[in-house]
Regions:
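Short, amphipathic C-terminal "tail helix"
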Residues: 178-234
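Buried hydrophobic packing segments
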Residues: 13-14, 34-40, 64-68, 82, ...
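Gly/Pro-rich interdomain helix-loop hinge
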Residues: 92-179, 218-221
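Amphipathic alpha-helical interaction segments
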Residues: 28-32, 36, 55, 59-62, ...
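Flexible, glycine/charged-enriched surface loops at secondary-structure junctions
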Residues: 21-29, 45-59, 74-79, 116-117, ...
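Carboxylate- and glycine-rich phosphate/diphosphate-binding segment that chelates Mg2+/Mn2+
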Residues: 1-74
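Glycine-rich phosphate/pyrophosphate-binding beta-alpha loops
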Residues: 65-98, 192-198
């Protein structure tokens, strides 16, 4: 529960930061929440009964509220749209579904879109630069925008591994045939989700289908620690 809900907080904050409805006010809140999650979520997860762990849990409660203030004003994006449908269909905890999607959605949103999302104060596509800003704020390598995006994706994946989270839908014990039979319907529903309009990249339904395909299983052979997590969640 600590890992699932903590990664939901992270997704709230990151999506709010790159939203087309983001402002100077929400950016400050979102960035602070992101930094707090990376600092305190592992401590909260590992040391619940220690003094450090109890302080970390308090900090995570604060981070959750701060991220909530950010996304209540800036709203969310397709990460949540996809997670809503994925979790509902296959009974995957909400934060876990968000976490599995997050690295893939960051990569997707950081790519120059074929269709731009529009909002009066969102004059140009800046999602890739804002992901790189997050990487810099976390002390990650970000000498270029591309390096910053890559560093952030890697940091999210490393955090998930540290929390013993499944990295794929397959690792959650979902049968491949059942999953692939549902994803086109889920993608269409995700496109119509209330969170989609604030996403920095206006998605095509086919692109959402592809994200669902990409998260089913690892592109490379599953490592030992990932195999162990998959067995625990089967």
């Amino acid at each position: 529960v600590t890992a699932d809900t903590g990664l939901d907080v992270l997704t709230h904050a990151i999506e709010a930061y790159v939203s087309i409805m983001a402002t100077d006010y929400t950016d400050a809140l979102a960035m602070k929440a992101i930094q707090m999650v990376f600092e305190y979520l592992p401590k909260s997860y590992k040391g619940a009964n220690t003094a450090e762990g109890k302080e970390a849990r308090e900090k995570m409660h604060n981070a959750s509220c701060i991220a909530g203030m950010a996304f209540a004003n800036a709203f969310l994006g397709v990460n949540h749209s996809l997670a809503h449908k994925l979790g509902s269909e296959f009974h995957i905890p909400h934060g876990r579904a968000n976490a599995i999607l997050l690295p893939h959605v960051i990569e997707y949103n950081a790519t120059m879109p074929s269709k731009f999302a529009a909002f009066p104060k969102y004059k140009s596509f800046v999602a890739d630069k804002k992901y790189a800003e997050i990487a810099k704020a976390l002390g990650l390598k970000a000498n270029t925008t591309e390096e910053g995006v890559k560093s952030l994706v890697e940091a999210v994946r490393n955090l998930m591994k540290e929390l013993n989270m499944p990295m794929t839908v397959q690792a959650c014990g979902i049968e491949e045939e059942t999953y692939f039979a549902a994803i086109e319907r889920l993608a269409l529903d995700a496109f119509d989700d209330q969170c989609t309009p604030a996403n920095p990249r206006l998605p095509l339904v086919s692109e959402l289908v592809q994200i669902y395909k990409d998260i089913y299983k690892a592109k490379s052979p599953i490592k030992k620690e990932e195999k162990k997590i998959a067995e625990q969640n089967a």
